[in-house]
Amino acid sequence: MKKVLLSVCLFAMTGAAQAADIVRHSNGTNFPIARVVEVPAGKTIYFHSGMTPAPADPKATPGTPEYWGDTKTQALSTFARIKESLDTMKLDFGNVAAMTVYLVGDPAKGGRMDFDGMMAAYSQFFGTKEQPNLPARSTVQVAGLVGPGMLVEIEVQLAK
């Protein structure tokens, strides 16, 4: 009986340790980002380098909109590449605590960043029924990225 009681107590303590997990504080709106993400002591923090998209059409002329695609296409590709990278480390989008999205102004949008296109891609990976965890996130427009015609680079920080 003592062994059973000890096992139950140890199991309960394990559950309590699991409860001391990452806390995501809502921003108080329906917008799918966290206001603050709190990472308790004892968690491992990962700083992932920025990722850019793969060419949408490698047969097109490099640097053209056809080669890279629009902002939504590039963001989808970038998120897919991040997912592949995270998979190799046994991490996933649920571990993302913070994100910075760099968008180049789209010539087809008068030089303004296509925030809606990026959000259409982002919303497929974050705040879904399958993956409800939301990161703290900033999105900024930049003058350019490393590859001519690239419109998207995304950097994530994770905790597990």
Regions found by a protein language model. Give the residues of each.
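N-terminal presequence-like segments and the immediate start of the first folded domain
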Residues: 3-9, 13-80, 84-97, 106-160
